[in-house]
């Protein structure tokens, strides 16, 4: 059997402290209508990255509503995850010529077949996350559950050969969900296609309230000079997050803001073998400057430390060049810390209005925005507060639960 991630049950009513009552009431009402429904999310890693981040909070909340919710994780060797990482990149526009080779396709297909045989299928609804397990439905054609494919990446301009390979598997699902309409490939032929943005849990260890002086003390313990300015990027060690562009923008900004420090805080996940090489390359660049710090979940920087970085930093940077959503943007804004971010993917959803002035398209523009905000902290503070309200109204977990429960209800006919 596949691994089931061990999680408990949360209390949906906690959200009444931070969320509009009508949203919580609707979520509870939908839960009552679907009480006893067996729901299973499937992905490729129990930790690291946005999907795992979502499910850790999402599954316990679903259970609190009376939904029998589980989370199963597919298995794979390094070869399989190297292929699926390439598929992930190709959905975002990178080339993957090896997909034309029969042995590459067989590797993907055989792993999905093996995982299909080990999957606990005793559920009413499956939600399959991203390309890694996208072929499971194909190998379980006799299963009577409803199947939803959830795409978390920017698939607006996928590599044509990869899309042609994956599309038949995706089209066997009963519904597909994308973060935003512009991510939906025009050739996808599924009757039920919808959009919904991811969300954050304000009560998780990464987002819970921590006093500012405690956060600053944590950064002090990690070697930062808390009497100097700090900017931080939190992300996977991934090419699409443009860590080298962030370093270049920091160096340009430092010419006008002497003493500026940069933290690059990342995470590793079992389904991302590429991240090790990226981490090594980032480290090689960082050692040239004593004011660049590289930290990860393997060096003791977990969710609480990320929380501290996002609260104690003077600015958060998220210079992505492709981005499905970028949960770290919502996380930082929830803490009233302004973000300078790449004008990519789902990030603009989180930064409307005046915040959109800090969406950037180049290293130079990123550096200019960093300098302006560091020299005008009152502007950063005002917009940080505005950002928190945007997150409260649009990107808390209750809104995601409502959207998914509405979709599930429409599929199961209740």
Put a short name on every predicted segment.
Residues 306-307, 330-334, 348-349:
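Short alpha-helical segment that forms part of, or immediately flanks, the ligand-binding pocket
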Residues 329, 338-341, 351:
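Short hydrophobic beta-strand element within catalytic cores of glycosyltransferases
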Residues 1-38, 56-122, 196-202:
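A conserved catalytic-core segment of Leloir-type glycosyltransferases
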Residues 372, 379-393, 400-406:
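A short, well-ordered alpha-helix in the C-terminal region of glycosyltransferases
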Residues 353, 357-364, 372-377:
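Conserved acidic donor-binding segment of nucleotide-sugar-dependent glycosyltransferases
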Residues 40, 219-241, 247, 262-263:
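Conserved donor-binding/catalytic core segment of Leloir-type glycosyltransferases
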Residues 266, 270, 275-308:
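Nucleotide-activated donor-binding/catalytic signature segment of Leloir-type glycosyltransferases, i.e.
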Residues 321:
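Aromatic "clamp/platform" in nucleotide-sugar-dependent glycosyltransferases that forms part
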